Amino acid sequence: MALRRLGAALLLLPLLAAVEETLMDSTTATAELGWMVHPPSGWEEVSGYDENMNTIRTYQVCNVFESSQNNWLRTKFIRRRGAHRIHVEMKFSVRDCSSIPSVPGSCKETFNLYYYEADFDSATKTFPNWMENPWVKVDTIAADESFSQVDLGGRVMKINTEVRSFGPVSRSGFYLAFQDYGGCMSLIAVRVFYRKCPRIIQNGAIFQETLSGAESTSLVAARGSCIANAEEVDVPIKLYCNGDGEWLVPIGRCMCKAGFEAVENGTVCRGCPSGTFKANQGDEACTHCPINSRTTSEGATNCVCRNGYYRADLDPLDMPCTTIPSAPQAVISSVNETSLMLEWTPPRDSGGREDLVYNIICKSCGSGRGACTRCGDNVQYAPRQLGLTEPRIYISDLLAHTQYTFEIQAVNGVTDQSPFSPQFASVNITTNQAAPSAVSIMHQVSRTVDSITLSWSQPDQPNGVILDYELQYYEKELSEYNATAIKSPTNTVTVQGLKAGAIYVFQVRARTVAGYGRYSGKMYFQTMTEAEYQTSIQEKLPLIIGSSAAGLVFLIAVVVIAIVCNRRGFERADSEYTDKLQHYTSGHMTPGMKIYIDPFTYEDPNEAVREFAKEIDISCVKIEQVIGAGEFGEVCSGHLKLPGKREIFVAIKTLKSGYTEKQRRDFLSEASIMGQFDHPNVIHLEGVVTKSTPVMIITEFMENGSLDSFLRQNDGQFTVIQLVGMLRGIAAGMKYLADMNYVHRDLAARNILVNSNLVCKVSDFGLSRFLEDDTSDPTYTSALGGKIPIRWTAPEAIQYRKFTSASDVWSYGIVMWEVMSYGERPYWDMTNQDVINAIEQDYRLPPPMDCPSALHQLMLDCWQKDRNHRPKFGQIVNTLDKMIRNPNSLKAMAPLSSGINLPLLDRTIPDYTSFNTVDEWLEAIKMGQYKESFANAGFTSFDVVSQMMMEDILRVGVTLAGHQKKILNSIQVMRAQMNQIQSVEGQPLARRPRATGRTKRCQPRDVTKKTCNSNDGKKKGMGKKKTDPGRGREIQGIFFKEDSHKESNDCSCGG
């Protein structure tokens, strides 16, 4: 503390004496001063002597024997010359009243000092008035020493010197006035001046003369300018000039910039001598160049590598220059039908670096002797084609009976700097077993005023099984960039929503496992005009009437059979039809609403990039360090400095070298998607770099990375309100995306990024569809020809690939669970198939540890099997807002239960709205034996029953574990149904028991076996407890429901 006070005191010590600028000095006058006096009998100008016996002009007054003296002396007009505070130095002598014989009591030994401001010399004999107002009094001046008769006789001079100041002054000038009211004195000298801080060199900066402030306590900030070859650091460099013209409080400093070192006590910045360099600004001295580098001139900021040696972009400047590696050695190939295993040994010379990796270049040489060409996009590489760290690779999906040449390149961090191609070893192989050819012709099957039905034949060379077709169309009068694309699993499609009488251009292409073939040639078809349509109706009217009579009986029979056989099957079929209808009508939105446009609908994807993403010049981007690796290349952090804007921290995704055109297109598609979004909870695209290498996507930088790993690193560190705030941000971002008609498909905590302010932003747009078939990553599982993250995906999306905003809501519920469990893996160590089975059997995840009931209820609402019953993202945002505004709603936690454990919730419960009384509801769920118990305990209405918890069920007298489970699950579903009627309001549902970890669960078991004793309710045959290696907590497996009609076999996990 003492050192801190000392430092503060040193900051306030003046650095250099003030400079005084004189405005008026009476001692320099060579003639009469000519000041105005009032009355004439008062002050008198006389010649006198100063303390050095120099002749000077003075004023004196001594009317002490006359009463009521009021003698004024006024100077001439004094211009202030920009000064804000004026100082007056007065030298005077005063006669001691007591030394004057017979002096009356009115004798004074003081006088008053006044000033008056004016814009010009306007004073007269009578103006300003000789009184205190309008004059402004500065002070009453008293003598420190006065002289007596003895002093006078001995010619002893006792001169007093007093300095007074006043301000602020703002007009062009001023007058001074001295008022005597009964003294005997002599005004020997008057000097009027102002002060300013002098020019000074301090902390490597030059500060020019600065006028002091208007008040004695004023501190006027002055900006310094750095000495030659120095730059400011930390904060703008400042000194403060006080009211007395003294420099105080130095802030900031200048340091020699890169390439210069400080000499002569820091007053000069000298360029680094030849053979030395200095990379950064600072006080440190220049250092010698590292190995294999040199400088060519003084003032070097880095040393240039010698010929044949290079420095990578991210290498520190003090690191020795290195070279490229030699070729790999001893390549071994093993062919198996259309797949290949390659192995090799590292090169002899790594170039002096430790970042050696390998790239695989595939060339297809066909069956003839023509030149080889790069392989197509259908070839698969495991683990990847570029940037291999191990000397082996597995290559699959090659063409049958085709000759290939594979080049194994050895590259390191300076390969891109070298003008020479990477060194490589090559191997030639021939496979033992491609995209389909173009569709040759398309036919019009039928048309109406707003639709056309088309069909086409299979490609002449399908080269495998046709998975589906993609049809693109646009109005002939419009540009091809306005094309709309739709997919069809068959070679027939009906295009709806067209204009009457308009001509449309159609093209189609087929897709196999090898990818899409080429589009067919452009074909033109026209919809009917209104007149043509009316004519066709009249021609078909007799046929329609005749057919209707014959078909009516058949239709009635079909309807009756359909209703009787399976009402639920009808509902499912209706839902699927609705899905198809939605697929064709989803593009019709409210006029004026911004709609997401799929970049893959553009024939030239580069056009989508140009339309939605801003091109950034590579010179504006500075890559600093690699922070990760993605599917297409490295992810780096760096800075972006656009002209006219401040420098910002950004994340940079780079496209690895050796990419194919398809990889480049897929890589930039994410930018085309992100560029359409502008929301605080959606990752912001700054722009792209496509006109230089490497190709880059530049986004805002999120300091805390992905949400799942961030939560795991900060387990238990946040309040519930903070976690709800994160969830609210994610929901707001998803609401924005849903309003734009964008379906994410891969919403998970790993795809949410977190910045330093804990703001969560949705990211990862479009890349999941391009994941390689890597069996080592169980997150994405093949399903119906695509990759699906099973644990986060809604059941209809898994089974039918029906991705909608409602399926994103299901995924959002999983994200909620991830957040509240601090990044636990959903469904723990269950297999993906076990997860699918459990969801189909209507079980759901339990609440994580310390999860409020209201939040788990919202999760359950998101996991409604019927997607139409799930809340919209707008409702979710409103619900979370209400929780944040009312924190008390988050205090109710799901309690632990010693008698029952229901980790996965049964959702197959009848709709309570179909019953009139609680008794009917109990009968419907086969719990009628408790009707009297419910009535006696006061649970006689659905509103009261919906609020029951486990302790209420126990108090009613339900002791059997299976019955507790049945009633509790039914109450939970009742709450969900109530929320669907009253809109989702985040009301608490079931409070779920938990184990010692974030959640509690039981081992899977064969539902056909009896695994517990019906007499004591204790579970037998359970697996041992497992320890989650990623979390270090004891957790138990998953509990699946048993046959609901076997009440005696309902079991629970141990407590």
Swiss-Prot record:
A motif (PDZ-binding (in isoform 2)) lies at residues 984-986. Disulfide bonds join C62-C184, C97-C107. Residues 621-884 form the Protein kinase domain. GO terms for cellular component: axon; cell surface; cytosol; dendrite; dendritic spine; extracellular region; glutamatergic synapse; hippocampal mossy fiber to CA3 synapse. GO terms for molecular function: amyloid-beta binding; ATP binding; axon guidance receptor activity; identical protein binding; protein tyrosine kinase activity; protein-containing complex binding; signaling receptor binding; transmembrane-ephrin receptor activity. It catalyses: L-tyrosyl-[protein] + ATP = O-phospho-L-tyrosyl-[protein] + ADP + H(+). There is a cross-link at K891 (Glycyl lysine isopeptide (Lys-Gly) (interchain with G-Cter in ubiquitin)). SMART domains: EPH_lbd, Ephrin_rec_like, FN3, SAM, TyrKc. Pfam families: EphA2_TM (PF14575), Ephrin_lbd (PF01404), Ephrin_rec_like (PF07699), fn3 (PF00041), PK_Tyr_Ser-Thr (PF07714), SAM_1 (PF00536). Residues 19-543 are extracellular. Its EC number is 2.7.10.1. ATP binds at I627, G628, A629, G630, E631, F632, G633, E634, V635, K653. The record marks T535, S536, I561, A562 as: Cleavage. Residues 324-434, 435-530 form the Fibronectin type-III domain. It is found in: Cell membrane; Cell projection, Axon; Cell projection, Dendrite. Residues 565-1055 are cytoplasmic. Residues 1-18 form the signal peptide. Heterotetramer upon binding of the ligand. The heterotetramer is composed of an ephrin dimer and a receptor dimer. Interacts (via PDZ-binding motif) with GRIP1 and PICK1 (via PDZ domain). Interacts with ARHGEF15; mediates ARHGEF15 phosphorylation, ubiquitination and degradation by the proteasome. Interacts with AQP1; involved in endolymph production in the inner ear. Interacts with SPSB1 and SPSB4. The phosphorylated form interacts with RASA1 (via SH2 domain 1). Interacts with EFNA5. Interacts with SH2D3C. Receptor tyrosine kinase which binds promiscuously transmembrane ephrin-B family ligands residing on adjacent cells, leading to contact-dependent bidirectional signaling into neighboring cells. The signaling pathway downstream of the receptor is referred to as forward signaling while the signaling pathway downstream of the ephrin ligand is referred to as reverse signaling. Functions in axon guidance during development. Involved in the guidance of commissural axons, that form a major interhemispheric connection between the 2 temporal lobes of the cerebral cortex. This is Ephrin type-B receptor 2. It comes from Homo sapiens (Human). The lineage of its organism: Eukaryota, Metazoa, Chordata, Craniata, Vertebrata.
